[in-house]
């Protein structure tokens, strides 16, 4: 819905087929469940954006090739405005992923630090400053997908997704 034709062509199939793992970079230590109060900043440097900040509770961040990060691009407007989503290469210089160890020793969740991470302008997802609308769409789709995942155990849900993809002919 928000991706450009080039983004759809480049990223959607490997994401859909799980050839490439993606993560969502939403939550921040000081924001709790108030996504709009985030403090991770993306500053336009002319060629792209420089991102600085921290995300937490990032599921599979340590395995992800790509991430969807929501940032503040305009600090001078109300908090639900001035947010922008980007596609970020998790292997970029300045991305530091730190696993959060659970009592079991496992670490599906991570803290992710961004220090002067360069993101090209073509990696904006949606429109500059329209990140709140994008976040609502992502979260609503996620909730529908979770609710729709009530399938019989062993029924081959990933195989079903790949079949749906192949039927779309993208």
Language-model-detected regions and their locations in the chain:
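FAD-binding glycine-rich core of flavoenzymes that anchor FAD
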Residues: 1-28, 46-47
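Residue-level signal for inorganic ion chemistry
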Residues: 4, 86, 114
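Short Gly/Pro-enriched turn/cap motifs at secondary-structure boundaries
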Residues: 30-33, 57-60, 75-77, 101-108
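Short glycine/proline-enriched turns and hinge-like loops at secondary-structure junctions
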Residues: 34-36, 60-64, 79-82, 106, ...
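A structural signal for short hydrophobic beta-strand segments in well-ordered beta-sheet cores
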Residues: 40-43
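A short core secondary-structure module
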Residues: 52-98
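Glycine-rich beta->alpha junctions and the first turn(s) of the following alpha-helix
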Residues: 95-170
